[in-house]
Regions:
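N-terminal subdomain of nucleotide-sugar transferases
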Residues: 1-57, 390, 402-403
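Carbohydrate-associated surface elements
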Residues: 41, 166, 187
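Aromatic "clamp/platform" in nucleotide-sugar-dependent glycosyltransferases that forms part
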Residues: 298
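Conserved donor-binding/catalytic core segment of Leloir-type glycosyltransferases
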Residues: 4, 209-226, 232-235
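Short alpha-helical donor nucleotide-sugar binding micro-motif in glycosyltransferases
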Residues: 277-278, 285-290
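Conserved acidic donor-binding segment of nucleotide-sugar-dependent glycosyltransferases
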Residues: 330, 334-341, 350-353
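Short hydrophobic beta-strand element within catalytic cores of glycosyltransferases
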Residues: 315-318
Length: 403
């Protein structure tokens, strides 16, 4: 099968941690299919001299990738973002498909990426599916302009793939037909993310802790809705209570400077360490080195970083948002209310003083092989339905629900 994948959320040499889950899915699909990717890059980055190049992980994936420049109007005329992205990627699309016609089109993020997937499906008369990741169906629909775009993309796509049951319910609440929405959970690369010796992992990442000091990791993009300010305030409370916890923040983003200043104002610069971006293959050692992982976002879908953490034998504390509850088994995790620094501090204390780490080491993750299998099976159904109109789709085996 020839599969065209469209999404801005995809890694390159300068941004190796962006959309690693999409690369993992495409890599696994490419084992039995031909996969080509179009991942537009903002013209603002290009003007700054940041031209996307293939990273080693993408180059070794067996997937052909194009990074066209995305021309758009920042912050206004957002209803035209889909059309602007489509216009921007036309040359790359024509080049990738000159002697190669896709049998199926897959996109990630409802708008504008999903609109481009929808247009590509129409252009090539191929079934199209869009993967929704979280805020695109939790927050964007509240916008009067982009909300209409999201609903149209989800309604007109042949299938909508959600990464959690909670997001599936959100799609249904938007009026999307139930027979067009499927939950296919993301996987974990168990060859990389598995438990191991903590001391050896700490040596590999260059961390040395004082006697009695604990290590917590936070992984993500440093943007407002990730609420790292809450983590900083929780850290101050823990320090005041005599808890010695070092927080290593792995990632980059526009809010870093603001949060560095907050950490200084709260007197916790010795506990809060901004590490910067870390390659996806190196994250496993950070998880193994840590005593727990933390997320404190106001909004999430079903973040893979938490399952990667548990797959490495490390429990987590997270705000109870999005679909996180679906994977938050109480024996290896603690959920706390969003926006509450004191509750976050108490949750961290609970995990550090409990037996959560032992339980985390028993976790068996779902693999990307399973995710790719379910995705390919869905496309086979959609293609079969086009060849035999009126035939109802058979149920997909939802083996993802077991993990």
């Amino acid at each position: 099968m020839k599969i065209l994948f469209i999404s801005e959320t995809f890694p390159d040499a300068a941004h190796p941690t962006t959309g690693t889950y999409n690369l993992a899915l495409c890599r696994e699909l490419a084992r039995t299919n031909e996969v080509r990717v179009i991942s537009p890059r903002s013209w603002i980055d290009v003007v700054r001299g940041e031209r996307a190049q293939l990273g080693d992980d993408v180059r070794s994936s067996g997937v052909e990738v194009a990074y066209p420049t995305r021309w758009y109007t920042p912050s206004f005329a957002q209803g035209y973002y889909g059309g602007q992205m489509w216009w921007s990627m036309r040359s790359a699309l024509n080049r990738l498909t000159r002697n190669w016609k896709p049998d199926a089109v897959l996109s990630y993020w409802a708008h504008p990426d999903g609109e481009c997937g929808l247009r590509a499906g129409q252009k090539f008369d191929a079934p199209c599916a869009v993967i929704v990741g979280g805020s695109d169906v939790l927050r964007l629909p509240k916008d009067p302009v982009r909300g209409q775009c999201v609903r149209r993309v989800l309604s007109e796509s042949d299938s909508v793939i959600t990464v959690s049951d909670g997001l599936l319910e959100s799609c249904l609440a938007l009026g999307i037909r139930s027979d067009s929405v499927r939950t296919i959970r993301q996987g974990i690369d168990s060859r990389t993310f598995h438990s191991g010796d903590q001391a050896e992992a700490r040596a590999r990442v260059g961390i040395s802790l004082a006697t009695g000091e604990k290590l917590a990791v936070w992984v993500g993009r440093l943007v407002g809705l990730k609420r790292v300010d809450l983590l900083i305030l929780a850290c101050r409370r823990l320090k005041e209570r005599g808890q010695r916890v070092r927080f290593c923040l792995l990632g980059e983003g526009p809010s870093r400077s603001e949060w560095e200043q907050l950490a200084a104002a709260e007197g916790v610069t010795d506990q809060i360490h901004f590490i910067g971006p870390v390659g996806h293959d190196r994250l496993a050692d950070w998880y193994r080195a840590a005593d727990l992982a933390v997320l404190c976002s106001d909004s999430e879908g079903l973040p893979n970083v938490l399952r990667e953490s548990v797959a490495c034998g490390t429990p987590f504390v997270s705000t109870d948002v999005g679909s996180i509850r679906e994977i938050a088994e109480p024996q290896f995790s603690e959920l706390v209310p969003s926006g509450d620094a004191e509750a976050l501090a108490r949750g961290i204390e609970t995990v550090l003083n409990g037996s959560h780490a032992e339980a985390a080491k028993q976790f068996v993750p779902r693999t990307w092989t399973e995710t790719a299998h379910d995705t390919q099976a869905l496309f086979e159904e959609l293609i079969s339905r086009r060849k035999s109109p009126g035939v109802l789709p058979r149920d997909l085996k939802q083996n993802s629900s077991a993990h």
